[in-house]
Amino acid sequence: MEAQSHSSTTTEKKKVENSIVKCSNRTDVSEKAVASSTTSNEDESPGQTYHRERRNAITMQPQGGQGLSKISEEPSTSSEERASLIKKEIHGSISHLPEPSVPYRGTLVTMDPRNGYMDPHYHPPHLFQAFHPPVPIDARHHEGRYHYEPSPIPPLHVPSALSSSPTYSDLPFIRISPHRNPAAASESPFSTPHPYINPYMDYIRSLHSSPSLSMISAARGLSPTDAPHAGVSPAEYYHQMALLAGQRSPYADIIPSAATAGAGALHMEYLHAMDSTRFPSPRLSARPSRKRTLSISPLSDHSFDLQTMIRTSPNSLVTILNNSCSSWSASGSYGHLSASAISPALSFTYPPTPVSLQQMHQQIISRQQTLGSAFGHSPPLIHPAPTFPTQRPIPGIPSVLNPVQVSSGPSESTQHNKPTSESAVSSTGDPMHNKRSKIKPDEDLPSPGAGSVQEQPEGMTPVKEEGDKDESKQEPEVVYETNCHWEGCSREFDTQEQLVHHINNDHIHGEKKEFVCRWLDCSREQKPFKAQYMLVVHMRRHTGEKPHKCTFEGCTKAYSRLENLKTHLRSHTGEKPYVCEHEGCNKAFSNASDRAKHQNRTHSNEKPYVCKIPGCTKRYTDPSSLRKHVKTVHGPEAHVTKKQRGDIHPRPPPPRDPGSHSQTRSPGQQTQGATGEQKDLNSTTSRREECLQVKAVKSEKPMTSQPSPGGQSTCSSEQSPISNYSNNGIELTLTGGGSVGDLSVIDETPIMDSTISTATTALGLQARRNMTGTKWMEQVKLERLKQVNGMLPRLNPVPPSKAPTLPPLIGNGTQSNSSCSVGGSMTILPNRNELSSTDITVLNMLNRRDSNTSTISSAYLSSRRSSGISPCFSSRRSSDASQAEGRPQNVSVADSYDPISTDASRRSSEASQCDDLPSLLSLTPAQQYRLKAKYAAATGGPPPTPLPNMERMSLKTRMALLGDCRESGISPLPPVNAPRRCSDGGANGYSRRHLLSHDALGNGTRRASDPVRMVSNNLSVPRVQHFNSLNSFNSPALPPSMEKRNLVLQNCTHSEGGVFRGFSSPCPPSISENVTLEAVTMEAGGSLNDEDLLPDDVVQYLNSQNQGTCDHLLNNVLDSNKMHHSVVLGNNNPSSFDRAPPASSQPAGSEVSKSDLPIQWNEVSSGSSDLSPTKLKCSQRSAVQQARAFGLYNNMMVQQQNLQRGNVYQQNGYQNLMENNGSYSLQQNTVLGSGASSSFGMQPNKPYGESVSRQPMIFGAMDSSCGITVQGQKLRSSNMPVSGNQQNFGHPIASSDQATSMANGMQNRNVMEQEYLQNELVGDGIHYQGVNQSSPMTLGQVSPTSQSSLHQGPQSCPPVSHTIGNQSSGLSVAKSYQPCANYSGNRRQNVLRNNLAQQQGHVSDGNQTYRVNTIKLEMQGQSQQFCSNMQNYSGQLYDQTTGFSHQAMKIGSSFFVSEANCLLQETATANSSELLSPGANQVSSTVDSLDSNSLEGVQIDFDAIIDDGDHVSLISGALSPSIIQNLSRNSSRLTTPRASLTFP
């Protein structure tokens, strides 16, 4: 039979081979087939022939070589044909069973493709049996059990095998592939006979063995020409079309294959990757355009862990079970169904007979046309039908294809359009059709009049192009802009990267409060975004930047949005998490947009998306279709403008909902769709997909479409790339929309998410990019824009109330932020600016929860906007949650959504944000952050540094840390008064609010989360204080000046919301790396919280320790510090620091108090131990926080370590350490040694920490050596002295000395320097820093002048620190913090004094040390709290100003000033310290360590910070979130910096 088949098909095969091999010969074709089939980008000509031919090939098969050749030429959607061609190519030289030109397609079944013999028709029953097994197979596929080695077992395997093997389809396909010459051909191609062929064959095999394919083959062979085709086709097709043959084989082979399941399995094993490979194969082959289309690389398709992915994906599994019964449908892409026909059709192809299948196929096809959901639901047959039809008759393929395209195009295709998510399900057999249809809609869009069917043939090529278009989605690459066209800027760059960096750092970051695209001719018309990340993502439309690249081998797609990439990856993995919500409908989609489209078209006749162009009455079921329509008919600009302006009503009808409700297109539409309307609809499907995508991306129905970007995205994006659509039909559509949609990051994001189909997603993203890239589109847009200029207003007003918060958020320090921060659901906030700060604040307060509404990219928005609302609790909360969760959320807002699931991504973000508090809290932000840090440390990546997000998270995280706050019972919203830091709410938190009673306690306001929360005065101060300690203490001490200062700093730093905007280095990178940050934050969602800074246990510990523990710790800190020192020193890893400090902390804690374990973390900040656990917690947080915090922490740690080593009481030892290391060395070493820098996971911090340590040492290192040593001890007792540049502590001590009248030569000098630096730094450093807040003058005031001054001193103190230099400053701040934190160290100070005294002898600075101790003692009583506040504030401010002072201030002076301020603060806060004594100490400790770390971390970021002027924020970030929380508002600011620090 084989021989017969061989001879009979030899001619045909040769023809096919000629046509295919001619083109590319096996290798080339294989390659292309693999890539393009997976990608749906068929090779042109031959490639195209075979790849699109696959499906048609089967159909053409009966016609023999002619049909095949014809199909080869025609970009049919026949996967089988393609498969066959591919396989043929692959096996070109290998003489496989000649594909018998046996004139019986139906008879095809007769041939056992495996054996190549004309075996009985096993397919009908077996096929279905195989189909049935596929359901289990699906599960197996998910489980990865479908590694069938299509063993070349020849006959193998007839019906029984097929039936018996649930993997029948998979096996058959794979086997078929190999089976051709069962043993020889199969082995030859499958085995390593041809390296290229092997992979390719594997790929084909994967197609074949893919249950989908098998099903398709069966479905196609069976359905269209069921029995006949299966028999002959498998052998014939196998040779003729590797894939189709495989499919046929599966149909006929699979049956026999099942018999030799073992061998088949082995073969599969051989092609184990083929499991996945077959996945791609069938997809490529059977439904190359389907989801598989996107996966260009066979690897991604077949060898990709589709099974794993699908297995992992519950939805996907369900879908697979439902849709791809026989396939894990290609590697578990349930809907991959790739042999979707198989899966839905074969698997569920009820008719066991080929005829029935054929009939069913036809019926399904019509149904499909009618249904458009046929592929997804019970009509799995439909899919197979399309597949079969394609397989069946050559004309049938086009015919069926056309119908499929017509019906599938509008509905299925539309669904495919996306990333063929539905397509994956629906067009199981005919991804090409669907895809073609999908593409067609794009093409149709250009010519809405064209008929859907008419375009179908075109669609074939377009299908091929679709993959390209998918890639074209990356068209922004086409844009590849290197010149800046920002308003008032015309700089030219050599590379796109440089341009992006410039835009992110100079323009986006610069406009901290306003997220407005000022790109010339931007269709957004300067409509503000809700979050910076959105703007960053949006700018990719203009620059063409596509930072998100597909990691699949052979796949070159890149996306501007992470969501789109994630969606695209689903095309490789076959994951279809979006299941139709309608009862009885099992269709699943890779993106929400496709699902929405499907639902709207199939299950609803509603067409909620109405064209807003005057005189146009078109209505669509999904936003993408509307966008496409607008772009194609009215011009990209018109749509963009409309959508951008919120003109697009689609938003009102929830994009997703419509998707759910309307399948307007379904049957009727498909029919209608054939007409111009259908075309429109087809395009609409594309558009709709895009819109839906937008929706999906938005995850919130309207959000996606509607956000300021939405309009564009939805409408403009659709057809804007009309011309593009050819490249990437959908993509183009998206591109147009992309441009516009990109206008609204949200839309873009939605598109990403919505563009579930990898292609579509990519397309959506890239379409936007394309739009930019497509000058044509831009021009059209401009024209349209002009035409629709009147409509812009409409669009703009869409959700002004919500949106207002976003732009101001970054722009103005606190207040702006407030505005920005409004919008918990910033996702859809189009006119964030329109709301006033107050409104936003109020709204935020209402929404405030944690920007829970700002689900979308609320992370940024939320944190920013929340922060923007900063005055409100929301801001902080948002920031808090945002920071913790917001950060990832922020990161993933636009790009960092869960691209994979729009809702998931956005909702994830939302959940993240909303969940922030709970979820982050559940995992404690500290824990999350630590996890991130650990992960970063483990992976060698940068520590969790989404500073902006972190900052934003700061507020939100603060909220999440409200876990801390909440733990403490801090739930009150801060008044909506002055906005705190833009992002962090720090401005408000810091500057706007004074130290409230609870704040003063250091427990009061919980970090940014709870600015004014009056919880309990002790409110678990430790936690709040421990990072918020700076804030907490500062809050009381420097509410006025701090407020101002923080305001400025906040504005500058904008840690939460405008995280990026405030930092040049970390922030800009964040902005530039927004995608990365988004991804990182998305993946490490709530890792940047206060908890991030502090481990859970530390937080708990701090909470439990509170203030009382602080004092106790103070005593034990000395011993603890000793242990700490060693421990801390031992912990040199950034993440190690996180863990190690606690570990090291434990010894110290045991010394001091095991319950102070968290102090161990604080230990990291040497003062921590002495301080209260809270302090330690803060320190820990700080450590966890990152480099910036790390600097402060580091120093503290160093000191602590030194002290520990030298024994706090053994100043000599400590001195020796100091001497050995040099005050600097010690600190530096300690920081580094203790891993404060590295420990904190801020490698950049390390250098910074080192530098900082050295710098401070330089000007006051010797001094500080002693002082620091002493201080280290003191810090142990009072945290502050321990700070790395303990000069700062020493200086603060000196300051204290002045205040305390204990002026050692060094201390005096320090004090003097500090005073000088304070004045200078405050005036110069702080102002220089750009904080330009009262802090500079406050610092001057506070400097060594008085304790009351010190109260304000925190503000001034930080500047001093800053002035010290980035590092020095950080140290100063740390010191400042520590002295402030020392208030609880009365006895600690005494001990320190003793220690210092001891130390003095050993260190030249013994006096200073002593003085510091004395001062500390005095201060403890009076200014500890104040000092703590000051420290906290200083830390924040200091961190912020550090960058500036780093540049403009003398390190030594700064150091001393900081010290003086700290001491002053301490002294001034002596009373406060009493109030905050335990908690304050803890906070102090935290501050101390924070100071060290912060300084260090800040220093790390100082360069960037200096540029960004967000130093305070940075340091704030360095400071533990608790401190930030403590200071509530102040805390917010601190928090923001903390985030910054976290993301150097």
UniProtKB/Swiss-Prot annotation:
How is this chain modified after translation? Phosphorylation is essential for its proteolytic processing. The repressor form (GLI3R), a C-terminally truncated form is generated from the full-length GLI3 protein (GLI3FL) through proteolytic processing.
Which cell locations does it reside in?
Nucleus; Cytoplasm
Keyword set, alphabetical order: Activator, Cytoplasm, DNA-binding, Metal-binding, Nucleus, Phosphoprotein, Repeat, Repressor, Transcription, Transcription regulation, Zinc, Zinc-finger
ZnF (C2H2-type) ranges: 482-509, 520-542, 548-572, 578-603, 609-634
Give GO cellular component annotations, separated by semicolons: cytoplasm; nucleus
One Pfam match, given by its short name, reads: zf-C2H2
Q: Where is the composition biased (Low complexity)?
A: 865-882
Q: GO molecular function terms here?
A: DNA-binding transcription factor activity, RNA polymerase II-specific; RNA polymerase II cis-regulatory region sequence-specific DNA binding; zinc ion binding
Chain spans, region Disordered: 1-83, 373-477, 622-728, 865-919, 1126-1155, 1327-1368
Compositional bias annotation for Polar residues:
1-10, 402-429, 660-685, 702-728, 1330-1355
Tell me, in one coarse class, where this protein mainly resides: nucleus
The keyword Ligase is assigned to this record: no
Q: Where is the composition biased (Basic and acidic residues)?
A: 463-476, 634-650, 686-701
> What's an example Gene Ontology biological process for this entry?
regulation of transcription by RNA polymerase II
Q: Which PANTHER family match?
A: TRANSCRIPTIONAL ACTIVATOR CUBITUS INTERRUPTUS (PTHR45718), TRANSCRIPTIONAL ACTIVATOR GLI3 (PTHR45718:SF5)
> What role is this protein assigned?
Has a dual function as a transcriptional activator and a repressor of the sonic hedgehog (Shh) pathway, and plays a role in limb development. The full-length GLI3 form (GLI3FL) acts as an activator (GLI3A) while GLI3R, its C-terminally truncated form, acts as a repressor.
Family per similarity comment: Belongs to the GLI C2H2-type zinc-finger protein family.
Q: What is this protein called?
A: Transcriptional activator GLI3
Lineage, highest ranks first: Eukaryota, Metazoa, Chordata, Craniata, Vertebrata
